[in-house]
UniProtKB/Swiss-Prot annotation:
SUPFAM superfamilies: Cell division protein MinE topological specificity domain
Function: Prevents the cell division inhibition by proteins MinC and MinD at internal division sites while permitting inhibition at polar sites. This ensures cell division at the proper site by restricting the formation of a division septum at the midpoint of the long axis of the cell.
Source domain of life: Bacteria
Alphabetical list of Pfam families matching this protein: MinE
The protein's name: Cell division topological specificity factor
Coiled coil: none
A GO biological process held by the record: cell division
Tagged with keyword Cell division: yes
The entry's keywords: Cell cycle, Cell division
Family (UniProt): Belongs to the MinE family.
Amino acid sequence: MLKAIRRFFGEKASGQVARRRMQVVLMHDRMDLTPDIMEALRNDILAVISRYMEIDSRSIRVDLEQGKEYMALVSNIQIKRVYRKAAPDIRS
């Protein structure tokens, strides 16, 4: 039964998952993005988006994806609600 479900929905082989992880590590390395820089980027994105929306700060993911001709910064953030008016910018 489990085999049929996996065949129907598909399952990534552990080799594919490991390959994707290695690609992400290599992208970070090529761009010279240290874990500290990625964390700072995550925190900055969190601060800006928090002015406009209530979000689950524990759920934010920031990744780099690379296609044949591009590199993209992709974030996944759970939004709890959108504010009617933006919060004031506290950086000034």
